[in-house]
Amino acid sequence: MSSAASFRTENDLLGALDVPAQAYYGIQTLRAVNNFRLSGVPISHYPKLVVGLAMVKQAAADANRELGHLSEAKHAAISEACARLIRGDFHEEFVVDMIQGGAGTSTNMNANEVIANIALEAMGHQKGEYQYLHPNDDVNMAQSTNDAYPTAIRLGLLLGHDTLLASLDSLIQAFAAKGKEFDHVLKMGRTQLQDAVPMTLGQEFRAFATTMGEDLARLKTLAPELLTEVNLGGTAIGTGINADPRYQALAVQRLALISGQPVVPAADLIEATSDMGAFVLFSGMLKRTAVKLSKICNDLRLLSSGPRTGINEINLPARQPGSSIMPGKVNPVIPEAVNQVAFQVIGNDLALTMAAEGGQLQLNVMEPLIAFKIFDSIRLLQRAMDMLREHCIVGITANEARCRELVEHSIGLVTALNPYIGYKNATRIARIALESGRGVLELVREEGLLDEASLADILRPENMIAPRLVPLKG
């Protein structure tokens, strides 16, 4: 192919540009690529967003055909193009950076141009021959970026958050399995990094499962609550200018059928076009999940610390050598990585919050950052949870002897004896044990405060890790 044949010339408001001949995107996409060299993350990085865009364009084409505004031939070609995008074809043509000026216009035009050029080829024409089928007049008919783009974002989140839920559920099951496995392992609970009272390692891991289970339940209901109300049909600011009066209801109905999602028209299109509250709340829930996940990873790192000079109650699977200077050192790299993912998700939430606050009047031009951060948080969390489960949780083992040793030598054990020997005796025993370094049980035996049978009964794990009725004294 000659140099001249390697490009096609397209024109827009600002003049002419040479677009790569093989590209399915067009001049407006090319301008955006040249303008926004920012994150290095293109739209194609998030396939469900591309699918959401294609579904919106398909729904719009269906409605416009039914209303008599789009010819059968154009509708058929656009439908073929959208179907291919929904199947996963041509996603590499979505090249615009996720961070962009223009409230998402570059993303919308990237979709319009790619769909138009795929459709043109299906009609037997060349890419760029927009006199036969136009990105704006036909693919974008009765739409504005301001309703098509946020609708596609919502749809992409609805379509994609199931993978996050599946990863979270699998992690919860892994925690629960470890809870069952470690149910018999007695250890010391700790508050404020100090010895507290006995518990089992199983209880600790079941608590991890429970707290993450709360988030799973909330995330399952939150997306349908927040993201199914769409402003498609509102066009520029929510008034529906340039759309058939019958278009909005029909387009949203078609979108629900195409996507399989229970989307409904927004009650107030002007409010829905400018307000980003749903994204703020959904991102806040992702942040909550990240915070909980990070706290669990902090605990795993502490419980496995040592191995000789730390707590060392559990062993994390060794994943790689830990030091270039200290031979034999193995670090808890998986929980450390998850901590960092959590920090990123928390940062994403703050950036999204500021973007939501930064809108003015009838539109929020910061929607591209909102989309980027919320899709990024979902992707990071999903991958982090899979990594944590596969490379850490399922391989954790308990150091049972170490756990029992710490219980037997802990001052905190005196709390379990308090109802039987009295607070005064318990306080004195604790002080002597602390000052002398001797064990609580050793001192109780030495002073004859309890016989061996009573001690054995009190110290049975099931009697120390749950409420127990203590007989009243005389």
Predicted ranges, named:
Residues M1-G474:
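Conserved, well-structured ligand/cofactor-binding cores
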